[in-house]
C-alpha cells in the first residue's frame, strides 16, 4: 500500500475551547510526523446525507506513518487537550496514483 488519505469527520463538538487547544497542538504534531493537510474546515457544499460539520483531510506517505503519528507523544498530548470535547470519525483510504 502506498500513500494514504485520512478523512476526519467531526460528528459533534461539545467544547469549543477544548477543540481550539487540541487544534493548536495537533497541527504541528501532524505536520512534524509527515502529514500534509489538504483541506480542513466546514464544507462549502454538501449533497445527499451530507452534513455541514468540520472535516479534515490529510495525506500521509503510508498507513504506518499515519498510525505512528496518532500514537506518538505529541499527538497524544493534543488528544488529552481535546478530552471528550468532540466526537469524530476517522477514515483511511488508499490514495489513487
PLM features: residue spans?
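C-terminal structural segments of small proteins and small subunits
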Residues: 66-91
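Short S/T/G/P-rich N-terminal loop/turn motif that feeds into the first structured element of a domain
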Residues: 1-54, 61-71, 94-97
